[in-house]
């Protein structure tokens, strides 16, 4: 498991064999009451409307590529940002950031929700 961030920002991060672990991962995520398959946009919209205060990392696939779902504080539109991890750097829209704080500081108009950490099939606060 790779540790990506320090508190207060947490992350949903998963690596491993999709076939052998996806079922166990999905079962554990359902217990957290926020997980929805990323391909279902309607589910994501409902997620952001019904759960108070959160930006969530949702795995698009079982690799380092993650999707950050955010709600703009001004126009209330749902936006998604694809995050790609390269060693200790994050690449977002062709720009490199040392950590997610740098991105969030640059785009202060985005309403930031707390992130969730999912580590080895269990909820964690680290």
Swiss-Prot record:
Superkingdom: Viruses
Biological role stated in the UniProt entry: Plays a role in virus cell tropism, and may be required for efficient virus replication in macrophages.
Record family assignment: Belongs to the asfivirus MGF 100 family.
Protein name stated in the entry: Protein MGF 100-1R
UniProt lineage: Viruses, Varidnaviria, Bamfordvirae, Nucleocytoviricota, Pokkesviricetes
